[in-house]
Amino acid sequence: FDVNDEVASPYGYRIVTNYCISGRREDDKGVERQMTALEIMRPLLETDRKTDLTPQDIFSLLSRSYKNSFTGLDYVRDYRKLVSKKTGIAVDQDFIPRRSTSCSVVFHGVRPGSNPLSTVMWTVLGYPACAAAFPLMVGETDILPDYVKPDAAGHSQLCDIAMDLKSENVFKWNVSNGSHYMDMESV
């Protein structure tokens, strides 16, 4: 995707959730999540506010959002009204971060005329609500910190920590349909 292509990206940005706009239409997935992302970002990106947005803002607004535009629910905004009064438990359905989410990426591009190799790829490795963002220079090679590199089992230490936090604190019920519920008190 090219954000400089005015036909593909008329506003100079591109918001994509996996499987929402590629492949066969009958296989579309993530459409609700993309609707939410566009609803959150469009007002910001179509004003002067877009120049103030940082990758961290985008992670907070999108990757860590518990809003569902399809249903109108926003667990962050309306937490006290929406979750179970006794337990803080909420049903996980069509939020941008899914139970299976293991990474979120924001590319921080450069201004026209600047070296494109100065682009920074900000990465949240692991479940976004339980993980930290770190920068990687696109134009560099062999720069991955050891805690990001895969170990002998193919796992990143940083990702494993975030995924452990997710299973211990957010999706902590593994019986019956328990995996479809999240503990919003921990989020």
Residue ranges and their predicted role:
Residues 1-187:
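C-terminus-biased signal that marks the final domain/tail of proteins
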